[in-house]
Amino acid sequence: MAATSDPISPPVLFYDGDCALCHGAVRRLLRWECLNGKRPAAQPKLRFAPLDGHTAEALRKQGELPGHREAVILWTDQETAEGEAAVSAALRAIGRPRLAGAFGRLPAPLRRAGYRLTARYRHRWFGRVPAGCPLPADPARVLP
């Protein structure tokens, strides 16, 4: 949220801001959305914010977001998706339905188990984001 009086407009993908895997995934989603259709997206379809940031905290205080910080969360005006469901919904939102469909074709128990395993060991396997490695400074896309 750029200023405290600005409303937070959905959809927003909340991610672990310290996780190198999550950070890289957000960079990739930003790039894929911009390259969708071989031209920059005229109207961005997805915004991003860290789970431990000001935007997430404001929504938690309003009861809009769960209190935990173990899974990526896609917050929209209709629903809140978590974990592997949020990943699939984010891919569809940026115009990558084939990739979302491929992900969705995995059996649900396997998809959930794979997500939980990766989420549990993400810092050990992929590391943490160095302090001097911010996402692009685009307040319309990347929220605090």
Q: Language-model segments: which ranges?
A:
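Local sequence-structure signature of Cys/Sec-based thiol-disulfide redox active-site neighborhoods
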Residues: 2-37
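N-terminal cationic amphipathic segment used for targeting or macromolecule association
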Residues: 1, 39-40, 54
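A short helix-to-beta-strand connector/capping loop
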Residues: 42-45
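Thiol/selenol-based redox catalytic cores and closely related redox-interacting motifs
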Residues: 51-144
